[in-house]
Amino acid sequence: MTPARLSRLVAVDLLQVASGLAIEAAWGTAHLMMYPLGLFSASSPVLAERRHDRRGLSPEQRGLLHHGVEAAETPILLVHGIIDNHAIFTVMEHALRRRGFQTLSRYDYGLLTQNIPRAAVRLGAAIEELSAATGYARIHVIGHSLGGLIARYYVQRLGGDQHVHTLVTLGTPHQGTQLARAAPLLPLVRQLTPDSPLIQELAEPAQGCRARFVAFYGDIDHLVVPGRNARLDHPDLNVQNIAVHGVGHLSMPNNGRIAFTIAQALRELHPDGTPGTP
């Protein structure tokens, strides 16, 4: 590679990173404005209307229903991140609806959460409630940041793979985050350090776990440090790790490419949990 070509590639890469940081700042501002909208919600799932009528659906939506009604109607539960609420998923929810997924629900675990295993028990109860209410034995869960870790604990450690077909995580500190060392006195944050007992517990054997996992991790994530710690690397789990370039922590639930990839992954349902090809 010539020096000139290398310089051009570096310049393009830096431009993409700068653009990603600017978008991250913009989404951070927008989310602060939307945040109050998510305060008025119970912790139990908010059930979305299930639509079976194809009239008024886009060709893309009709195509999904035509090729897989069960995939289109499998419930999806959205779980937000730390110090947040379901407003972070406003764009993601709209994007998934446009792609034909019609049964979306939201779960808020509360600002006072201090213990991930206990939060996982409560989330599990909500998932099982949603499963019973919709008649689907297994649903999908999309978790942002801490929400993905709570959901993973339920799926991997509490038998939640019996109720969750696919867990998608966005910027989730599966291997902890070095940033957590800055606040060691906070019980919840302490669980997020890379060498915490919780992170070590999640690294223990998980043979027989039926769920599939799709983990997105970015290179400019300012909360998961280093960004590769959002990868889910476990020999017993069925995982697809997806790197996203130039997308920040808050931008992940609002990124069109990520929403498209999630939709592609959820289009196909396999009883054994093996993923479709995004």
Outline where the language-model segments fall:
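Flexible, membrane-associating and regulatory peripheral segments of lipid-active enzymes
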Residues: 1-76, 90-91, 99, 268, ...
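Short, proline-enriched alpha-helix->beta-strand connector loops that line the catalytic pocket
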Residues: 72-74, 207-213, 235-240
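Serine-dependent carboxylesterase/thioesterase catalytic core
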Residues: 76-87, 93-210, 216, 223
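Short alpha-helix in the alpha/beta-hydrolase fold that links the catalytic acid
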Residues: 92, 225-232
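Short glycine-rich catalytic loops that host catalytic nucleophiles or stabilize transition states
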Residues: 106-110, 241-248
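Catalytic histidine-centered segment of alpha/beta-hydrolase-like enzymes
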Residues: 115-116, 247-256
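Acidic catalytic loop of the alpha/beta-hydrolase fold
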Residues: 219-225, 249-250
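Post-His helix in hydrolase/transferase enzymes
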Residues: 253-267
